[in-house]
Amino acid sequence: MSESTNEDSGAGRSSLEENSNGQRSQSEEAIAEWRSSEQVENGTPSTSPPYWDIDDDDDFGSKPSQLFGKNTWTIEKFSDINKRELRGDVFEVGGYKWYILIYPQGCDVCNHLSLFLCVAHHEKLLPGWSHFAQFTIAVSNKDPKKSKHSDTLHRFWKKEHDWGWKKFIELPKLKEGFIDDSGCLTIKAQVQVIRERVDRPFRCLHYKYREELVRVYLGNVEQICWRFVEEKRSKLGRLIEDKAKWKSFCAFWMGLDQNSRRRMSREKMDVILKIVVKHFFVEKEVTSTLVMDSLYSGLKALEGQNKNKESRPRLMDTEESTAPIVSVDKDSFALVDDVLLLLEKAALEPLPKKEEKSSQNRTKDGNAGEEFSREAVERDDRRLTELGRRTVEIFVLAHIFSNKIEVAYQEAIAWKRQEELIREEEEAWLAESEQKGKRGASEKEKKSKKKQAKQKKNKNKGKEMRKEDKVRTQTEEREIEKEECVRAIAESSAEKPDTLGDVSDVSDSVDSSAEILQLDSEDRESSPVHWEMDASEVHPPSAGDTSRGRGNSFSIPNGVAERKGLSTMDDSSSTCSNDSIQSGVANGSYKGNVLNCQSQKWFSNGKIQPGKVSDSNSLASEKEHQPSRLASDPKNQSHSSDIRRVGEADIVISHIQKPESPKERSPVSKDPNMIQMKEKSAAVLSPSRAAPWNPPSPVQAKPEKKGVSNVEAVPNRKVISVKSPSSHHASPSREAQLQTVGPRADIQKIASPKPVEQPAPPMSRPLSAPIIPPTQAAPVISAVQTSTASLARSMSSTGRLGSPTHSQAYNPQSYKHAIVGSSGFTHPSSQSSGTSTLPPYSHPSPISVSNQSGFPINVGSWDVSSGGLLWTGGSSSTRDTTTTISGNHKTNTYNAPVVTTSIRPTNVQIGRTAQSLMTDEFPHLDIINDLLADEHGTMDNSVYRVPQQFNNQYSYHGGADLGISSRSRSYSDDGFHQSYGEYMPHSASSSPYGNGQTQSQWQMANMDFSLPAMRNQDDVSASATATYSYFDLDSSNPNLSGINGYRDFRPSNGH
C-alpha cells in the first residue's frame, strides 16, 4: 500500500498530518472497507499462513495476541468545541492504560488537528518504567477508503509518556466527510505492545494487525531483506571471481580433513541469531516488527523442514520452495553440502522476483465495494516467510564462511607467509653469519699473521740478542786471551837476557796480598838493583796477583827530560830465591784512609808549563770492604810510575789508574766498545848479556798469542819519547809535542814484535860472575798512551814527551857515569807506557788531588837549577824516598789540599826490572856506591810526621831508601803551584837504628813516628830494595817478626 506516515514530535506530543502531495493514496472509505473486511461477521476463521499465527511454546511471556488492543473515540459537536485540548477515555492494552489526546486548534501549530497516544497515570508508575509499543491512529471518514491512518513504533518512558502527530490533518479537510451530518468526529486506535528479545528473532505483531501492515509495508520488508542478501552474495562472488584466491582457497579447503571441514561447517544457533536480531531490529523503524516477524517465520520454516512437519495442504500445494542451504541440527546451524558448492550456489543463484501485484486498496480511486481477496493475504504471508528463510540461510552461510572458514584460511596464509618470512630471515641470517664468519676468519687470519709476524720478529730479535751476546762473549774471551797473551809475552820478554827494556803495559797492579821480600843487609849489598840501569820498563802484573791487585793510576808529564841517561830500578826485585822467602798474604778489608802511594822522585830539567797539566786525581777513593777485581779487566790494571836517574838526568814516567765502577767488576759485563786496549811498547836498552832473572811468581803466566787488543774507538793518543842529550841538545824549557796516532793498525805498526819465550827459572846470580856486554840493538818502538777526556778520577800527567824515540849508539860507560851521570853517558833508552782506554767513571767519594805546578813533592830540601832539581842536603849518590801525603788536613798552611774522604789502601805493584840489567854492565857497582857514600856522605832517610793524625792506620810504600833510582809521586793543583814536600819536616838522624836493619813497616796514626828501631843508614847499597808492607798490628818491634832475617807480612786484622 502506498499510504505514508509523517511523524512530528514535540512537547511530548505527536501529530499526524495528511500528506498534502497526495502520498496518502488510500481514502478513508477504502481503509474502512478493508478494515471492515477483516472483521468478518460472526468470527470467520483467518486465512493467514501456518507460521504467522502460531505462538510457539518456547516463547516466553504474553503472546502478541494478548498484547494487542483497539479503541474507538467519538466526539460529538466537534465544531462547537472551543477547548484547547480534549482527552478520550482510558483503555487498557498489554497491561498498560492508555488514552487519546487531541488539540482541536492544534498543538503549537495552527489550522491543524493534533493527535497523541498517552500513557495514563504515568506519574504513578515506578521509576525506570518503559513501554515499547507499535500503534496506529485513524480518523474515520464517511468513505472508509478516505479514512486517515498513521502508524509508528515508539518506546514510552517517563519523559516521553505521550507520542503522536502535531499535524495529523488540516482542519478544513475535516469538513470533507470526516465530520458526519450530526457533527460527530470518530477516532480509532490500535495498540500492539512488544516484548522484544535480543537472543533470537521473535514474534512482534498479532496476525490481524500484521495482515493490515503487510498490505502497506511488504515492499519495505523485501527491500531490507534483499539488500542484505545481495551484500553477502556480492562478497562471495568477488571471492569466486578472483581465480588465484579462489584456487588458493580451494587448495586450502581440500587440504583439510573431513573432521576439520565438518567442524568448520557448523555454528551454534544462539551465536548467529543474536547477530541477526542485532542487525535487523531497529527501534524507531515501523517495518522492524514486520522484518522480525518474517525472520521468525523463516526460522520456523527451517526448523519445520528438519522435523519433517507437514504444513497445511493448501500451503504446500501453492508454494514451491528452493533447495535449502542451511539445516538446523539441534541447537546448531549446519551447512547441508560442501562449502565450495554452497558458496557458488549462493553467489550465482538468482533471488526470487518481487511481486508486481499490489493491494486493491492501493489506488485512491479504488472501488469501495470490492471484496477483500483472501488469496492476496495468504500470498503476502508466504512471501514474508520465504524472505525470512532465505535471509536466515544466507546469513548463516556468510557467518560460517566469514568467521570460521575464511579466518582459518587467512591464518593458514599468514602462517605460510610467516614461514616464508622466517625462512627469508633465516637465509639472511645465515648469509650474514657466513659473511661475519668470513670477516671473522679474515680478521683472525690477519691477527694470526700479525701475531706470527710479531713472534717471528721477537724470535729474530731474540736470535739477534743471543747472537750479540755470543759475539760479545767471544769478543770478551778474545780480549781476555789477548790480555793474557800480552801479559805473558811481556813477562817473557822482560825475562829474556837480550831484550831488557820491554814494556807490556802501563799498569802495575800492587796487590795487598803480594809477596813482599825483605832483604837483609847482605842481600841488599849484593843486590843488582844498586847497579845503574839505563833502561825504562813497565811490567804487567803477574799471573798470581792480577786477580787481586788494584793499583793507582798516574800519568806521564808532558815534558821532555833533557838528561844524559835513564836508570830504572825495580822495587819489587830481589836477589833471594823462592826458598828463602816467606810471603805474607794480607786478607780482609782495611778501614780508614790508607794512602797507598808509591814514593817517587821527579826531577825536571826544563820548565814545566802549568797550562798543559791536566787535572786529575792520583789516588782512587775507595769505600770500605771493596771486593777485589779480576785482573782480566783492563780497567783494574794499576799503573805505576818509575823514576829513572842517571847522574843529573831524571825522567818521570807516571801511569793512569782508572777506578772501577761497580758495574764493571765482572769481566763478562764489560762493554765490548769499551775494551781497554793494551799496547806493548818496548824501550830497548843496551844491557850487558847476563843470565836471566825471574821474580818469584806463584802462577806462571802462559803466553798464548801475541797481539794488540782491538779497540773500536780510540781517543787521541800521544806518543811519548825520550831524547838523549847526546844526539839532540834541548832547551831547559821545552813544550810538549802531541802526536795523534791512528787506530789499531798504526799502533800495531809501532809495537815491536817480541818472541815468546819461556822464562828461565828464578835463580840468584853471584856477584863474581863475569858479565859480557851484548851488542846494542837500535830501539824502534815508541810508547803510545791513550787517555779519555771523560775520566772523572784520573791523574793525568803534567805534559807529554813530544820528541819521538830514536836509536842511539852504544857507548861503554864508566862507573862514574853509571852513578852520577854525565854527558858521555849515552846509554840508549826508550820510554814506554801502557795504553788503556778508560771509560768515564764517577765515584761518590770526591778526592781532589791534582798537579798543576809540575814541581815534585819532595820531603828533602831542594832547589831549582838549570840542570834540574838537585838535592842540597846530600851527595848525588844518596837515595831518597819522596812520599806525598794527601790526608785530612785541617790547616791550609803551605797551600796544602784538603781531602775529606777516606782512602783505602791501594795496592801498587812496582814493575820488575831484570836484575841482570845493570849487574852485567857494572858488576862492582856496590863497592863503588860504598866509596861514593863515604865521599859525599849518606843522605838521611827522612821519616816525616804529618802535622795532623790520620783517622785510621796507614802504612807507606817504599819507606826505605830507593838508592839511585828512587820513586816519586807528583801532585799538582789548580791553585797551588808549589811543592807539597816542604810541608813535611826532615829528620836529621841518618841512622836511627843501631842494629843495622832498615825499617820496612811504617807506623801511622797512633803509632810512634820516632822510629826507634830504624835500620842504620850505613848500608846504602841495600836500601834500594826496601819492600813495602801494609798494616801490621805487631809493628812495635819489626825485628821480632820474620823468618831467616826476612820480614813477615802481617795484615792489620791480626791474621
Curated annotation (Swiss-Prot):
GO BP terms in the entry: autophagosome organization; innate immune response
Function description: Functions redundantly with TRAF1B in the regulation of plant immune response. Contributes to the turnover of the nucleotide-binding domain and leucine-rich repeat-containing (NB-LRR) immune receptors SNC1 and RPS2. May associate with an E3 ubiquitin-protein ligase complex, which modulates ubiquitination and subsequent degradation of NB-LRR immune sensors to maintain their homeostasis. Functions redundantly with TRAF1B in the regulation of autophagosome formation. Required for SINAT1- and SINAT2-mediated ubiquitination and destabilization of ATG6.
GO MF annotations, alphabetized: protein histidine kinase binding
Species of origin: Arabidopsis thaliana
Stretches with biased composition (Basic residues): 447-460
Regions annotated as coiled coil: 441-496
Knockout consequences: No visible phenotype under normal growth conditions, but the double mutant plants traf1a and traf1b, or muse13 and muse14 are extremely dwarf when grown at room temperature.
Ranges of Basic and acidic residues composition bias in the record: 433-446, 461-486, 524-537, 657-668
GO cellular component, one term: cytoplasm
Keyword Coiled coil: yes
Keyword annotations from UniProtKB, A to Z: Coiled coil, Cytoplasm
Sequence ranges of Polar residues compositional bias: 37-46, 569-586, 723-740, 823-845
Residue ranges of domain MATH in the record: 68-191
UniProt keyword annotation of Chaperone present: no
Region (Disordered): 1-56, 352-380, 431-590, 603-772, 820-845
Protein name: TNF receptor-associated factor homolog 1a
Compositional bias ranges of the Low complexity kind: 502-513
Gene: TRAF1A
Locations listed in the record: Cytoplasm
Complex and partners: Interacts with AHK3. Interacts with ATG6, SINAT1, SINAT2, SINAT5 and SINAT6.
SMART domains named in the record: MATH (SM00061)
